């Protein structure tokens, strides 16, 4: 019985870790290690206090988080750039004086709407490294914050170097006097990434998951370590942007000599803006993208199941991809046209590319050229999938030359491997590429990481800075379902086409030769009824004459003059 009571007390104690702040008359009281929810408003700035600080605590790290509205945390009541920080995720480090047991600071917001926030105060000892303790770039003397910047292509985080810990009342170790193992140059920085649930843009979910990224133990248990930096490296890391997908980043500074660690202030992003005019964080997406991707998916789905039988339709699909991809890269890099205009021009250019490939097959009948295009499209998807794996994050592939040469070799390897069995290559391309177009269409309606298999390659071709970005995407329940749908469509399409084409010629005959043979047969065989069909030119003249007759007035019949009496 007493064990049950202890268990209940433990659960209640754990639940109190996420409590509302004790607030009265603009006064907030915090406890070490307890996450506190409260609301900040512009009219009522708050003074925060922490009491009963233990004597073995050397410094405190306070942090406050909100979803997209800015909050300000300051050492003093008067806001100055050197004593305050403003943003969605901001924090301060408090170096404690001897015998200090109480610490105060100030919180406020300039936003007109109330800001729902969560905050926590963490304590560290003299053996723990101090995040941002060797700041030379930002305004605060000691800056534990991570500064985030994003665009459509990449998200970049940067932070100030840390310093080794020291006791109360001691002088801080110099940052750049020496580079030995007794200085801050021995420190290591582990960069972690944590994905929020896909499609979840709620404030409550973000504030809850941020609690998993504040303390060292929880960060190491919940997030994925992306890269480790030394003191010689720049404290800047880039990631591929995922618009509409919530991501939390944090940095753990580790002292290998003392085996101690400390966490910076975690920072989050959705790679989009909640308060923009377009509201681009909130679905639905662009109508133009939905129309384009849906029509493209319908053509791809038809190719997946019937592409080899309807050879010319498949060639149009392949030519559309081939020319449309390169044309979109060209106009995006060389012009400043709006997205909708570029999408329409890409659709027109892709259609021209498809018609050209069909026309070249009809006139010249060069099977090798057509299958080279088909094989390269399949090879492009295979190569994109290869670099979608952790292999793409190797440092050697951050060089554009190495990346594009390797990418091209993998893409060329696919048609070379299937050089002796072109029909199998064609059916595989129909099934895999055609079914993947459905994945791209799904991405225009709901987020799926699988679309970034090819979108990351497109981003790298469009933006030179993307080469240094780490490519990581969430793989959650929706992605497993869509991956199963993709695999099911591909396997079904390939199987049906292989069974249907048994006993048939590998490819249709040359259309132009068939047309010439048919024309010669009509000329030589006078018993053929089609021999008596007039030439095309005479038939066209006849059609034009009949159309003209429709617009001519009907002539009256009989006498035009009155009868003589």
Curated annotation (Swiss-Prot):
Position of the signal peptide: 1-21
GO terms of biological process kind: cellular response to unfolded protein; negative regulation of programmed cell death; positive regulation of insulin secretion
Gene Ontology CC terms, in alphabetical order: plasma membrane
Transmembrane segments: 287-307, 311-331, 341-361, 364-384, 402-422, 427-447, 478-498
Subcellular localization, as worded in the UniProt entry: Cell membrane
UniProt key word Nucleotide-binding: no
Pfam families recorded: TM7S3_TM198 (PF13886)
Membrane topology note: Multi-pass membrane protein
Glycosylated position list: 22, 56, 70, 259
Domain of life: Eukaryota
Main location: membrane
Keyword terms, alphabetized: Cell membrane, Glycoprotein, Membrane, Signal, Stress response, Transmembrane, Transmembrane helix
This protein's record includes keyword Signal: yes
Physiological role: Involved in the inhibition of cytokine-induced death of pancreatic beta cells. Involved in the promotion of insulin secretion from pancreatic beta cells. Is a downstream transcriptional target of p53/TP53, and acts as a pro-survival homeostatic factor that attenuates the development of cellular stress. Maintains protein homeostasis and promotes cell survival through attenuation of endoplasmic reticulum (ER) stress and the subsequent induction of unfolded protein response (UPR).
Protein name: Transmembrane 7 superfamily member 3
Taxonomic source organism: Rattus norvegicus
Gene name of the record: Tm7sf3
């Amino acid at each position: 019985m007493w064990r049950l009571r202890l268990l209940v007390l433990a659960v209640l104690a754990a639940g109190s870790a996420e409590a509302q702040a004790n607030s009265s008359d603009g006064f907030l009281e915090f406890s070490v290690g307890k996450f506190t929810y409260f609301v900040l408003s512009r009219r009522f700035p708050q003074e925060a206090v922490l009491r009963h600080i233990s004597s073995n605590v050397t410094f405190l790290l306070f942090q406050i988080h909100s979803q997209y509205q800015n909050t300000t945390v300051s050492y003093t009541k008067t806001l100055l750039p050197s004593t305050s920080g403003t943003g969605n995720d901001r924090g301060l480090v408090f170096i404690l004086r001897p015998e200090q047991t109480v610490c105060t600071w100030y919180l406020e917001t300039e936003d007109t709407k109330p800001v729902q926030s969560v905050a926590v105060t963490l304590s560290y000892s003299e053996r723990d490294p101090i995040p941002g303790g060797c700041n030379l770039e930002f305004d605060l003397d000691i800056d534990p914050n991570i500064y985030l910047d994003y665009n459509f292509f990449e998200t970049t985080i940067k932070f100030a170097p840390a310093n080794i810990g020291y006791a109360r009342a001691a002088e801080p170790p110099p940052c750049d006097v020496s580079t030995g193992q007794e200085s801050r140059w021995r420190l290591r920085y582990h960069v972690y990434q944590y994905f929020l649930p896909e499609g979840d843009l709620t404030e409550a979910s973000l504030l809850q998951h941020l609690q998993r990224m504040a303390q060292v133990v929880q960060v190491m248990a919940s997030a994925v370590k992306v890269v480790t930096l030394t003191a010689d490296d720049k404290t800047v890391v880039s990631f591929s942007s995922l618009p509409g997908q919530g991501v939390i980043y944090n940095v753990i500074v580790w002292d290998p000599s003392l085996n101690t660690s400390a966490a910076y202030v975690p920072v989050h992003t959705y790679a989009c803006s909640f308060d923009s005019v377009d509201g681009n964080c909130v679905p639905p997406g662009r109508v133009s993208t939905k129309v384009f991707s849906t029509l493209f998916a319908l053509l791809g789905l038809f190719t997946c199941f019937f592409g080899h039988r309807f050879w010319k339709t498949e060639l149009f699909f392949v030519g559309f991809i081939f020319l449309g991809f390169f044309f979109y890269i060209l106009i995006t890099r060389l012009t400043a046209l709006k997205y909708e205009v570029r999408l329409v021009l890409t659709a027109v250019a892709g259609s021209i590319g498809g018609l050209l490939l069909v026309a070249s097959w009809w006139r010249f009948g060069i099977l090798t050229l057509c299958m080279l295009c088909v094989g390269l499209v399949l090879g492009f998807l295979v190569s994109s999938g290869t670099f979608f794996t952790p292999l793409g994050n190797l440092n050697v592939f951050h060089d554009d030359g190495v990346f594009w040469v390797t990418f091209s070799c993998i893409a060329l390897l696919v048609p070379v491997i299937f050089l002796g069995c072109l029909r199998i290559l064609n059916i595989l391309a129909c099934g895999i590429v055609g079914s993947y177009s459905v994945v791209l269409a799904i991405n225009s309606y709901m987020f799926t990481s699988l679309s970034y298999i090819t979108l990351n390659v497109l981003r790298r071709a469009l933006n030179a800075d993307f080469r240094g970005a780490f490519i990581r995407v969430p793989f959650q329940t929706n992605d497993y379902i869509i991956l199963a749908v993709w695999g099911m469509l591909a396997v079904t399409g390939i199987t049906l086409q292989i069974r249907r084409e048994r006993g048939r010629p590998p490819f249709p005959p040359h259309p132009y030769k068939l047309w010439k043979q048919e024309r010669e047969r009509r000329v030589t065989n006078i018993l053929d009824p089609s021999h008596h069909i007039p030439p095309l030119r005479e038939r066209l003249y006849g059609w034009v004459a009949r159309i003209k007759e429709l617009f001519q007035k009907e002539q009256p019949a009989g006498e035009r003059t009155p009868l003589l009496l």
